[in-house]
Amino acid sequence: MSVIKMTDLDLAGKRVFIRADLNVPVKDGKVTSDARIIASLPTIKLCLEAGAKVMVTSHLGRPTEGEYAEEFSLQPVVNYLNDALDCEVKLAKDYLDGLELNAGELVVLENVRFNKGEKKNDEELSKKYAALCDVFVMDAFGTAHRAQASTHGVGMFAEVACAGPLLAAELEALGKAMSNPERPLVAIVGGSKVSTKLTVLESLSKIADQLVVGGGIANTFIAAEGHNVGKSLYEADLVETAQKLMKECAIPVATDVACAKAFDENAEAEIKHVSEVQDDDMIFDLGPDSTAALAEIIANAKTILWNGPVGVFEFKNFEAGTKGISEAIAQSPAFSVAGGGDTLAAIDKFGIKADVSYISTGGGAFLEFVEGKVLPAVEMLEARAK
């Protein structure tokens, strides 16, 4: 993957436009989870230390495009940056006709979705963004799968378009896990539905040595082996697809499961062999034998790709499977990459953040990369590097 890297450029005195992912949750005007801002800070600091004139922007939430709405303003992010950095950070609301900046100064450009044409990758808007800068830095992996004016169009017209450190690290880690993995490669795919992860499963079945399935997805595979799944979430119309995937790749299917009669966090977990599941049972997690078997597979892996929990880990009585998988990944010396919103929540809950080699910041972008799709922002950066 050949792209220009920001770290290879001399940014002194240059106008630098960073497209970051600062789409953070905000409550009562305060940032409630700062993970994405923290991930972007090194890029911002590098530019400031290099003596660049720095502009950083992002989307936040889903405002009506082209209309200002205070609840979607980046002002809370500006307030956070003012506390986190040694310089004064201002918010620019009207910036499309140009800005005056000094070297070492940082300005946050208001939510890009307040600009009409942002989502449609409007050429005129893209050119206005490009006119603001000498160097465009794409550093938002989380939106790299969307061709929008601030993630794609601007890069087509900017004098120089490059990958920021966060994006470059993300591409490198995912490339290491997928393009040239040390084997065995074990892929873990959880989540509620096969249909939403079907392309991921198909893509990974071709490259993984073992494909571990969990959550509602696993129920469809249990049904594909001819077992009753009771009232569990599963997709009857995809049983044949599951059977086909099992012929193409080693997919260890659960032998025991944790069930209950109702979807309730206080419901008692009943451990059953898969052949004993009743018509009124609902499967919410892997059983201890299945968890132990998967932990052993993970222990022998050299590369691990993890997307999605393997049970309803939000409920104390049904967290054991995801906890067991998490701990096995944490203890494994393998190169591990994890991504997807629920996966990150599980990593936080079980405290294994420091033990995962790389945690992806992208939800949809992570999945599309794993599906083998070309990400528009990356395609643009490759084209501009030629």
Swiss-Prot record:
Listed A to Z, the keywords are:
ATP-binding, Cytoplasm, Glycolysis, Kinase, Nucleotide-binding, Transferase
Entry binding sites for substrate: 21-23, 36, 59-62, 113, 146
What are its E.C. numbers? 2.7.2.3
- PANTHER family named among the record's database cross-references: PHOSPHOGLYCERATE KINASE, PHOSPHOGLYCERATE KINASE 1, CHLOROPLASTIC-RELATED
Give the binding site residues for ATP. Answer: 197, 314, 340-343
Q: Which reaction does it catalyse?
A: (2R)-3-phosphoglycerate + ATP = (2R)-3-phospho-glyceroyl phosphate + ADP
Q: How does it assemble?
A: Monomer.
Q: What is this protein called?
A: Phosphoglycerate kinase
Q: Name one GO cellular component term.
A: cytosol
Q: Which family does it belong to?
A: Belongs to the phosphoglycerate kinase family.
Q: Name one GO molecular function term.
A: ATP binding
Pathway participation: Carbohydrate degradation; glycolysis; pyruvate from D-glyceraldehyde 3-phosphate: step 2/5
UniProt record, GO biological process: gluconeogenesis; glycolytic process
The record's Pfam families line, in alphabetical order, gives: PGK
Keyword Magnesium among UniProt keywords: no
> SUPFAM superfamilies given for it?
Phosphoglycerate kinase
Signal sequence: where? none
Subcellular location per UniProt equals: Cytoplasm
Top-rank taxon: Bacteria
Q: Is Kinase among the key words of this record?
A: yes
